[in-house]
Design a protein with these regions (language model features):
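C-terminal motif of bacterial Sec signal peptides marking the signal peptidase cleavage site
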Residues: 12-15
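Surface-exposed, beta-sheet-biased, low-hydrophobicity segments with strongly acidic/polar composition
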Residues: 17-213
Length: 213
C-alpha cells in the first residue's frame, strides 16, 4: 500500500510531469519561447498567453486589459492591483467575473456567432479543498490546501483523473465566455497544458479580448 501511495505521489509532482508523454496526455507539445502575452493581433483582438503554472504555491495573474502576467504567492497581500483571471496549476479564479462553458471548440467559430452566448454564467465560489499547495504529506493522507476563490466553470478546461496512476489528463477543447467585472467580454480556450518537453503545468491559452461583434 505504501508503495502505491509513493507511485501516486511521484506521478503528481511537477518535476515528474511528462514521464509518459504521448500515452496519457492529450495536450500537444509545441515549442513556445517566452512567457506572458506572447502574441496579439489588433485586427481581431485575438492573442495567445503562455505561462508557467508548475508551482503549487503560486498564482499567475493575467490582465487582459494591459496584457500583463504576474506571478505571485498565495496571500491576498500579493495580489496585483489589476487582473482579470488567475491560474494555479490547472485551477482558475476570476476578479469578479462570470463564466460560461460553451459548446463551441474554436474562437473563430465563437466570433462568427455574432453574440455572447446565453446561459447560466458561473461566478467564483469560496473553497477550502480545491487549491492544493502542499503534497509532502500525501503518503500519510495529508494534503495541504489553501483557502481561495475558485471558478468551477472555467476550471473545467482541463480534467485530471487521479483514479488511475499515472493520472489521465483531458482538455475540454471548448471556448469559455467570460463576462468581466467592468462589463467587457473575454473569450478564451486552453490549447495546451505542457511545454515542448512534455512537462505539465505550462499553459497555453488562446483568447479574444475585448470581444466585439
Amino acid at each position: 500500500m505504501k508503495r502505491l501511495f509513493l507511485i501516486a505521489f511521484l506521478a503528481l509532482l511537477p518535476s515528474c510531469n511528462g514521464i509518459f508523454p504521448g500515452i496519457y496526455d492529450s495536450g500537444e507539445s509545441d515549442l513556445v519561447t517566452g512567457y506572458g502575452f506572447i502574441a496579439h493581433n489588433p485586427s481581431d483582438n485575438s492573442g495567445k498567453v503562455y505561462i508557467d503554472a508548475t508551482d503549487y504555491t503560486k498564482w499567475v495573474y493575467l490582465d487582459f486589459h494591459g496584457r500583463t502576467a504576474v506571478t505571485a504567492g498565495m496571500s491576498e497581500e500579493e495580489v496585483p492591483a489589476e487582473w482579470d483571471i488567475a491560474v494555479h496549476r490547472y485551477d482558475v479564479k476570476t476578479n469578479g467575473a462570470a463564466v460560461l462553458e460553451t459548446g463551441i471548440t474554436g474562437l473563430e467559430l465563437f466570433m462568427s456567432s455574432g453574440k455572447m452566448p446565453e446561459g447560466e454564467y458561473v461566478e467564483d465560489e469560496w473553497t477550502t479543498e480545491k487549491i492544493i499547495v502542499d503534497m509532502s504529506g500525501m503518503m500519510d493522507g495529508n494534503i495541504g490546501y489553501s483557502e481561495s476563490w475558485y471558478n468551477p466553470e472555467l476550471s473545467k478546461w482541463l480534467k485530471v483523473d487521479t483514479s488511475t496512476m499515472p493520472p489521465l489528463y483531458s482538455m475540454s477543447h471548448k471556448v469559455y465566455a467570460v463576462k468581466l467585472a467592468d462589463g467587457s467580454n473575454l473569450a478564451l480556450k486552453l490549447s495546451n497544458y505542457m511545454d515542448a518537453s512534455g512537462v505539465k503545468g505550462f499553459m497555453t491559452i488562446d483568447y479574444v479580448y475585448p470581444v466585439e461583434f
